[in-house]
Amino acid sequence: MATKNNPIASPEMMNAIRNDASDAYKAAVPLATASNLADVGNPILAYDAMANEFLSALVNKIVATILYRKMWNNPLSMLRKNAEPLGVDVEEAHVNPATAQAYDGTETGMAAVLKMTKPDVAAAWYRLNRQDKYPVTINNEQLTNAFVSWNALENLIQGIVDSLYNANTIDEFKYTKQLVVDAITDGKLKTVTAVMPNNEATGKQFQVQLRNMSMLFTFPSSTYNNYKLMGGTGNDRVTWSPIEDQLIIIRADVAANIGVEVLSAAFNLSYSDYLARQIIVDDLGADGKTLAVLADTKTFQIREKLRRFTTFYNGSAMNWNYWLHAWDTFSLSPFHNCVALRTA
């Protein structure tokens, strides 16, 4: 998706850093105007302590606060659940509907009042499985050149965003898609055969199949979740997904061939309501067979564990090393409906 292009580097940004800086920084660095960037930069470049304070504020506060202007928007980010800052495992429990028993008014039936009937419970555990770090180095020459003009300072900021934040966001997108691809490859995700919609007839056929699957999701069933495929033991798990809990991840070329109006009609939703449940992606695997994935929103168990900046100044080389650490859990739930539509 496109990103906003308003510049970040500005006198307002420099003064925001100054406002939160130490007294020594404020005494040495003048207020910024549109025409005095060099005067602002001179004391920052002259003293390591000033440079450290400036870069720390730039990376940790300014860029982190307003980086959305420069960020690529991950369309799959809506699948993320609440952060889990404690522990490395997350448990999800599923309780099957109780089994009906015939009424028995005899003494035998009355005796059963003290009998224990345990609920049919199954549990899945999701473990922390991503611990990435993204490095960027800013050397003295880069910092010096950044104070030549506002455009040069903007380029420095963009480099930080690209190296740290955008790299992380792009990887989050790839990891989420890979959940689906790996599950299909490993035989852990149910699939149905669908036709590639490349004309009016096949488009209608795809729409009917998608609508039928969506309606079937709303009924209690064990047919469309992946509990047994993912190694679950014991009884099948009965679940259902109301329309408002469903989403579709669909390839861009497939969505373009059908059109949003047709797809929204498949779900019996308005244009705007359907768009809120549609996620368009570039591909769903190298084999090119997966056209779309219809899923309950709870299928995707993606949780942020940690986002942290660390820094190190190398006085010998006169450069600053920054790392963005990103720890997450990426998993698919076995308990909720999820089916991939694939060509033969």
Where are the model-predicted features located?
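Extended, compositionally biased alpha-helical segments that mediate assembly or anchoring
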Residues: 1-65, 69, 73, 263-344
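Alpha-helix initiation and N-capping motif
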Residues: 51-52, 177, 203
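Assembly/oligomerization interface modules of large self-assembling protein complexes
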Residues: 51-136
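Hydrophobic, Leu/Ile/Phe/Ala-enriched alpha-helical segments that form helix-helix packing faces
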Residues: 62, 164, 168, 214-217
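Short glycine-rich, low-complexity/disordered patches
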Residues: 71-79, 170-176, 180-186, 224-230
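Long, contiguous amphipathic alpha-helices that act as assembly "spine/axial" helices in icosahedral shell
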Residues: 119-189, 322-324
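Catalytic cofactor-binding cores of redox enzymes
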Residues: 181-204
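Extended oligomerization regions of viral-like shell subunits
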Residues: 201-309
